[in-house]
Amino acid sequence: MWRIRRPPFRHILFYTSSSKMRHIADIRIAEFDYPLPDERIAKHPVEKRDECKMLVRNGQGHITHHAFKDLPSMVPQGTMMICNNTRVINARMKFQKATGASIEIFCLEPISPVDYAQMFQAKGSCRWSCLVGNSKRWKDEPLTKTLHIDSRDITLTAHRIGPHGNSWEIEFAWDDDSLTFATIIEAAGYIPIPPYLNRLSEEVDSIDYQTVYSKIKGSVAAPTAGLHFTQEVIDRLIANGITMRELTLHVGAGTFQPVKSETIGDHPMHTEVFSVSRRLIDEIIGQLTAHRHIIAVGTTSVRTLESLPYLGALIMQTPDIKPEQMHVDQWNPYQEQFAQFDTLQALQTLSRWFESNGIEVLTASTSIMIAPGFHWRIVDGIVTNFHQPQSTLLLLVSSFIDRQTTIDKQAISKTNASDGATTSEWRQKNADDNLSKPECQQKDESDNMESPECESSNDTKLEWQQQDNSDNKAKPEWRKMYDQALANDYRFLSYGDSSLLTTW
């Protein structure tokens, strides 16, 4: 049993009044706009993944510029870094009608079998929710495509069953029952690169648009924050005392869905399926208990991790909830009934629920919206790219860097109940927790500026960016950061450069 010393009431509760809920829903997406020239959108990655640029913004708002390969020297020992190990599938398939018309089918999510693992092992036939390009030219006739697999000709047939929400239900069938759908889609389709790249998929995208640690097939878009990692960077992180862990969230096409409403309250967040193990839940509990940092690699990892306490809260409200009912709604974090719970208690409840249901891995779903005013409970560091103007991902970034004191890492005694440190206090006592900053992040106390040794310890020049106060006073923090990235020739979006955002 975890020994928890409850902090004062104000440190564990986050009360969301109806007025605050209205304020969050009334946030105008136009406030999250910025000029992004097309030439700043990276069409391809840099030649070596870890040689892209990396902007580092700390909890005091100081910004330095590095190469991504410097990441291991930026992260304190004892930190847990959590990556999304999903793998992008060849989700786009082109069929040619006898008339010559080209029909494109874009697989979104499985219908039958509904489980991703079972879907890719399906033989003979399966059904998907799909988008259809040039749909008006496709009547009721089946579409066929000849595939060449292991020196054999395989016929793949697509039948349009009917509407499925905002998409179509498509049945795929193939004339060799020995082949799985994983083999079929690998041969029939191609990687669905983001639409804003304004180019066709290339053969090299099948490598470039996958993370080096991708394992579990199911995404139709890459968790792009992870594209910069090389095995060398991962090995150095581990050697420096960083715990590397994985979860799975299958990225859907909704990640590219623009916000069309004037306010975010009218924007329906897309739903994505994720999987987490009981072991990871228990390790997160241990990390929070020991006051150690948790860095999420990418916004998909953020959404998964920050959804976990709300799954625990759902169980506390409905103890007999079934696995298939485990879903976090986009507004749950801002509703009063989900505000007044302790994060660790919720996670421990979730861990016990795993045991009582006899499962080791939970598959659930989330449509969580992380916007300014969100109560961050788990993540206190993010590795992320630079996102599109007026996107929900930009809302997430703004929420994180403006969070200040809203983190809910409780003041838990490390060894006994006599330690009364609050969440904010333990960050000042990081030496006792072996959380001292890496040398290249230490500052000279005499002038509060970076030491010369730090500058010489990296291949890239480390420079505190001086800004015109009169020009920046009215700008939100996210905009100041993005302006610096633009001014320093950063490349944006999926194949672009990286950033490390921390609260310390």
Model segments located where?
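Acidic, glycine-centered low-complexity repeats within long intrinsically disordered regions
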Residues: 420, 425, 431-433, 439, ...
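Surface-exposed, charge/polar-rich loops and edge strands
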Residues: 21-409, 463-464, 468-504
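Ala/Thr-enriched low-complexity intrinsically disordered regions
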Residues: 16, 405-406, 411, 415-417, ...
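Low-complexity, intrinsically disordered or signal/transmembrane-proximal segments
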Residues: 11, 15, 404, 410, ...
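Intrinsic-disorder-associated, low-complexity terminal segments enriched in Asp/Asn/His/Tyr and depleted
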Residues: 11, 408, 432-434, 448, ...
